[in-house]
């Protein structure tokens, strides 16, 4: 592996991590924006993943992306058990799917992106796995009334299910948009 490839993939991973920060800050608008950003953000994730997978045609494209997010999250004190397990499991699923479909194929990238697209939900999962702790943190860190609005979002399980289901077609759209815009990277895959 060339040094230039490693550096470019690490830069892509940092950009991917910045997208997590952008997704989480949209929660300042309303708690639902944070809770469901994981459904929309794959439109952006697709570009970073296609670039990374085209440059890194072997095991590790998804693992590097989620690994950098995990390391930065833990250093920043944002890591929790749900996030750690979620990011690792989703990256491993993506890697297994990509391996079974071919590291150098567009089909492998498309199919493996579906589990990877759920990665922001691994980051925000603490709302559902540690609701009391998340609400307490909201009371301490956010404006008055935020925790009440947040609780309403957390307890709206039907909407969470809908948003999780919608993540799949949004992920498929995100990777297809990336292919249309990033023709060189898409062409480097069979």
Question: Model regions: which residues?
Answer:
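Alpha-helical membrane segments and adjacent membrane-interface helices in multi-pass membrane proteins
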Residues: 37-96
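Membrane-water interface at transmembrane helix exits
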Residues: 19, 23-27, 53, 57, ...
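Short helix-perturbing small/polar motifs within transmembrane alpha-helices
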Residues: 5-7, 11-14, 18, 85-125, ...
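Short alpha-helical transmembrane interface motifs in multi-pass membrane proteins
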Residues: 30-34, 78-79, 158-159
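Membrane-embedded alpha-helical hairpins and interfacial helices in multi-pass inner-membrane proteins
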Residues: 109-184
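Hydrophobic transmembrane alpha-helices
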Residues: 2-63
